[in-house]
Amino acid sequence: MSKHHDAGTAFIQTQQLHAAMADTFLEHMCRLDIDSEPTIARNTGIICTIGPASRSVDKLKEMIKSGMNVARLNFSHGTHEYHEGTIKNVREATESFASDPITYRPVAIALDTKGPEIRTGLIKGSGTAEVELKKGAALKVTLDNAFMENCDENVLWVDYKNLIKVIDVGSKIYVDDGLISLLVKEKGKDFVMTEVENGGMLGSKKGVNLPGAAVDLPAVSEKDIQDLKFGVEQNVDMVFASFIRKAADVHAVRKVLGEKGKHIKIISKIENHEGVRRFDEIMEASDGIMVARGDLGIEIPAEKVFLAQKMMIGRCNRAGKPIICATQMLESMIKKPRPTRAEGSDVANAVLDGADCIMLSGETAKGDYPLEAVRMQHAIAREAEAAMFHRQQFEEILRHSVHHREPADAMAAGAVEASFKCLAAALIVMTESGRSAHLVSRYRPRAPIIAVTRNDQTARQAHLYRGVFPVLCKQPAHDAWAEDVDLRVNLGMNVGKARGFFKTGDLVIVLTGWRPGSGYTNTMRVVPVP
């Protein structure tokens, strides 16, 4: 323990410190210790999909307390009225904590577009009816609208009019996240005959994948345009754009959002082979990336998904863009109160790979244990963050960052380096547009980044970046700039103390600007907590 005593009583975060100081990655792994406590703060954002299991105001309040940072609305399902109700509930739940600036947690709202996806029709009977497709059986896949609402085990309608043109005999059609696979035997004018390779129970309106086929659907469908406009009206904070295949698709989404929606962050979901191949141009055009492993695992072989995940996380970390890891992270918790060991490892490894956010889909939307799932992700993420080999990561990101004459970037790198040197308990950053906080986040400090801002949207969007803990300052700006800086720094200090990030006597690093306005962060101080 002597190592910690050298640091004085100031250092409260043991969080695998012994391992963090190792010289090599191997030595770092050897020193990891299951008895070392992680920090109070969690650096990774948690995104929860809101659905029937979680949309009541009371449930949402509990989700926020358990650690939800971003509420995701999936526009593949539900009407605008339904989503409007959910947005209202999320805001009401968030505002219920607003009376006290210390405990207030901004929660962002994300609109996930349906995108250019292909879906099956309705099974005849009710909306919840299912039919069994048996292995080896013949199934006719048709475009004939007469079957749109009465599919059964013999005929399946799909909504993609060019189906016949893009698939050949011998191709495969996957339905419902790849659970059901069909082999194309012959082609007709408006149908294909298939043989069921992998059967199962089939419900209504399930997703269809055609791996390898050159699907020519527009990047932004008519429904997407209506949904995005609705999102702008509702003032959502970010859009998760589905099935992005090239940079032009991102520009198309941006165009629909228009002038009024120019502050909305666009996160591109990479879900097929083309998206992976053209990753660099997509990343360049987007505000961030989501590794959508569900569809990706059907479009490319399942055993290659981890390669795509690591490549995308690596490139986003190098470029300083946020990246979200999604799909099946704690899938078994839809029905069980505890995750499988594999899922626990998966969440931890996404964090170790360098993901900024981790996401829950069915676990919180329709599962039996939505709160437990959020708490589980929170607990695993904290442990994994403590086990990061920060030193190597910082040096490598520094080596790869382009040398440009931007003072804020130099400040950020210097502040993070100083935070390692003095074992700072936190970095407090004043930020209007959020840029200063994002730059610091890029260098991945061990300590949380308390970002104090007066802009409520900046506060909500800050959750996309690893380590940024937004604090919304509601006090009116002070006439004297220096006084105003002190006022905000003190708010950051009070929040950090109240949340147990640090205590009196600990060192924190404070980043401020010496004149008002956005883009002038140029002063760094190392300050003991009063």
Curated annotation (Swiss-Prot):
Pfam families: PK, PK_C
Record entry for activity regulation: Allosterically activated by fructose 1,6-bisphosphate.
Annotated EC: 2.7.1.40
GO molecular function ontology, one term from the record: pyruvate kinase activity
Residues bound to substrate: 72, 269, 294-295, 327
Assigned keywords, A-Z: Allosteric enzyme, ATP-binding, Glycolysis, Kinase, Magnesium, Metal-binding, Nucleotide-binding, Phosphoprotein, Potassium, Pyruvate, Transferase
Reactions that this protein is recorded to catalyse: pyruvate + ATP = phosphoenolpyruvate + ADP + H(+)
Residue sites binding beta-D-fructose 1,6-bisphosphate per the record: 431-436, 481, 488, 515-520
Annotated family: Belongs to the pyruvate kinase family.
Subunit structure comment from the entry: Homotetramer.
Annotated protein name in UniProt: Pyruvate kinase PKM
Source organism: Gallus gallus (Chicken)
